[in-house]
Amino acid sequence: MKPVTARKRSGTGATVNQMELRPENSEHLQLIRAYEAGSVQIGESFYASSFLLAPARSPVEWQVEQFSQINESDFAEILTLSWDVLLVGTGDQHYLPDLRLQRMLARAGRGIDFMSSRSACATYNLLALDGRAVAAAIILPLRASAVTGR
């Protein structure tokens, strides 16, 4: 939301500053509209498997089912994209990569943050709406217990 200019309230003798909020024009951005345990809505489409996302690019499937399986080749495609910050949603919990993967990603010379997939979805939208060069690699499901029925 973008602030609109303050207004002067008349008739009371006092000056009151009001801020009116209007939605930003985000039609051209690929944004996450909703998420639940087993799926994420981007625009009008729902995704039930892991995906890669950038504001100016349609989501593509990411062949990662759980963070423990992740390896260097899983980042090959996303490292070719233009971004300053990569958010890696690690699934239902927050995990950090092993030392080998950390070294490989450090060589990319760009910011990479690991967080739960739910947090990555929310953070992605904030950065995209702020005009940041962001990309996201989201592992689904967001919450294992909801998917398995526990």
Tell what function each PLM region has.
Residues 60-62, 94-97, 123:
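Short active-site-adjacent helix-start/loop capping segments
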Residues 78-115:
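Mid-chain, well-packed structural core segment of small domains
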Residues 117-122:
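Short acidic loop-to-helix transition motifs that present clustered carboxylates
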Residues 2-73, 81, 129-150:
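Non-catalytic interface/targeting segments
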